Amino acid sequence: MLHLKKSEFALTTTPSNRGLSHRSNVKHYSAARFVRWFMGLHIEWRKQPNDLGEHRMMLFALPGVGNVGKTAIDGLTQVNQCEELVRLHHTALPPLAELDEDGLLTPPHLSLSAIESSTGVRILTLSGTSQPLDPEHQGSLAHALMHWLSDQGVSELYVLAGLMDSPTRKECFIVPSSKEHRINLETAGVDVRRDEPSSGAIGLTALMASLGPLHGIHSACAIATTVGSSGDVFASQRLLEALDGWFDLGIALPADAQAMLSEKLASLAPKSKEDYVAELTESPDAFYM
């Protein structure tokens, strides 16, 4: 007969911990403190207690047009006190294992972190490097994420994204998914649009921004116009400044978009420098006849 130690498995009955949970002591890429399954999500808690805690809102972004949202969240986590709370694994994510900050191989996942401002405002961020390629998998993952986030007490979710437009247009606005939320935002002085994006939106982030009313979450898309270039740090900066102004978050913002752009370009530049002048002026080994 198989005997299980009490410390290894625990049967939970609360709505937020429904199912069989497993405590892992395995020394893998960064030993999980608590893992469990929820609607296809493999939830790996990185901190104790296994709870998201009180927070003002959640910001979510994935790589997209101009990488506006992803760059914005990356900038926030770099300049604010940030703590990773949980990693969300799902088989629908592309099978790309990457190195984490400790140089260890980690399976594909979305990372959920907490940022606390100097004024005590606590914000959750959710981001990743990829999304499912199949529309059906995007839908199943979006519903699983929204169900779990609602179960964890998330009530306000803003998806950060870029909208391709002309270089002269530099605007930021929010598109909510419910009338109640729209009224609340307009009352608070937020720039809310009803006619954009005119062609709609696709992908996992679009589903997350629109599924909120089905899960009791005020979800919306916070958009900055962009020329669509990879890593538009200027649009990301504008979007963060707009969010901070609308919601009085008090979070530290990346101080200089130009410096961020220079740093990004430097990281992309070749490490070895060729002396092309010397190469052109040196004496050739061969001769012309």
What are these regions (language model features)?
Residues 165-246, 287:
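Catalytic cores of processing enzymes, dominated by hydrolases/peptidases
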Residues 62-68, 132-135, 162-167, 201-202, ...:
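Gly/Ser/Thr-rich loops at beta-strand to alpha-helix junctions
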Residues 144-157, 213-218, 246-251:
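Secondary-structure boundary elements
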Residues 1-38:
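N-terminal amphipathic/basic-hydrophobic helices that include classical n-h-c signal peptides
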Residues 128-135, 194-195:
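Surface-exposed cleft-lining segments at the edges of enzyme active sites
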